[in-house]
Regions:
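Alpha-helical transmembrane segments and their helix-start/interface "positive-inside/aromatic belt" motifs
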Residues: 3-23
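Alpha-helical transmembrane segments of multi-pass membrane proteins
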Residues: 21-35
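Membrane-helix boundary elements
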Residues: 32-64
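Membrane-helix boundary/interface segments in integral membrane proteins
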Residues: 51-52, 67-90
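Pore-lining and gate-forming transmembrane alpha-helices of multi-pass membrane transport proteins
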Residues: 56-64, 110-113, 117-133
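Membrane-helix boundary/juxtamembrane motif in polytopic membrane proteins
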Residues: 79-100, 150-154
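Terminal transmembrane helical module of multi-pass membrane proteins
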Residues: 126-154
Length: 154
């Protein structure tokens, strides 16, 4: 691995740790942030009432669960990349699991559209990212097969 790739991997690892720390901070501060958001941006047509605040807060915490899983999986994938273990079946599996986390986020944000219509856009973005990651996992699988064949022929 050349110096540029090592630097990029280290930056990605650092950003992943920042992401995970941000998720922890968000989990701690979520009730206050949500109350502030609703009080600041509540319009007449907003469907979040005090009765449904608990439902929205629960959905917000549900959004964090796949985020934590995806962050941990990304840290593991970056560890594999730094060791040069890219074209291997476990790497493709990790990418597929991250895609599943994206699909989970898609479903949760689709539920959010009842309260916040902008969540539909986020849901479609998560769906697109999940599909793209499945394609990348398939490419890694093909690359793994080619690498295995080359290892046997050399």
């Amino acid at each position: 691995m050349n110096a540029s790739m090592k630097r990029t991997t280290r930056i990605a690892q650092a950003l992943t740790l920042v992401l995970l720390a941000g998720l922890v901070a968000l989990a701690i501060c979520l009730p206050w942030l949500l109350r502030g958001y609703i009080s600041k941006f509540a319009y007449e047509n907003t469907t979040v009432s005090s009765a449904s605040f608990g439902i929205v807060l629960t959905l917000c915490y549900c959004v964090l669960i796949p985020g934590f899983f995806a962050g941990g999986l990304m840290a593991g994938l970056l560890r594999r990349v730094s060791r040069g273990l890219i074209f291997a079946a476990p790497s493709a599996l990790i990418i597929r699991l991250i895609a599943i986390c994206c699909f989970a986020e898609c479903a949760i944000f689709a539920l959010f559209t009842v309260y916040f219509t902008v969540s539909l856009g986020i849901s479609f973005c998560a769906l697109f990212l999940g599909i793209a990651l499945l394609v990348v996992a398939s490419v890694i699988d093909v690359g793994t097969e080619i690498k295995t064949e080359n290892d046997y022929t050399v």
